[in-house]
Amino acid sequence: MLDLSHNMFVKAVKKSKKQENLSVLKELKNRDKEINKYQREVRRKIVTHFALQNNINDISSIMVLMNMVIDIERIGDYSKNILDLAIYYPEKLNTKELHPDLHEIEQVVKSRFDQTVNAIKTEDVELASKLLKGFKKNVTTASDRIVNHIISGELNFNTGSESAATVLYARYLKRIGSHLKNITTTVINPIDSIGYQSKGIST
């Protein structure tokens, strides 16, 4: 399910860079339905497993998995939003031309997604800790700065559609990054701290 969400995000970003055929974009949007289907299946399997085993020791693992599934599904939703941008934005969504900071956020989130998948599959605590460090500076603060500067009038674009596309894309990337952070915390945090900053780790 995480691989499917990752694949959808990568393709959504790639397709937004070129004026792709409308049918291709809509077909890719439908991948979100697959993610939603997997989410429902995982929930059913979790409930069935717990009902049959009735093992209290499994509760922690079950809650971790449930949290992770929700974050993965949300990433699929935001990837679908990126595809909507590609469909309705009249130009190619070239982040290098729109704003260098937006391009940097895009690259950071893409890299973090690759590494998050790896950290989850290998249960790599060191990699997970590394990913959590610098998240606020490289994603959250950078995204907020772009959005706030546009709203305040400090940052201007040639057209309203450019401004809107930049704001939306910055926000989508920020939210995807946040859900990736939540997923990463499942590797190192106890169940009550999933999605939150660990002590000693500066985000």
Model-derived regions, located:
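Cytosolic, long alpha-helical scaffolding segments
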Residues: 1-203
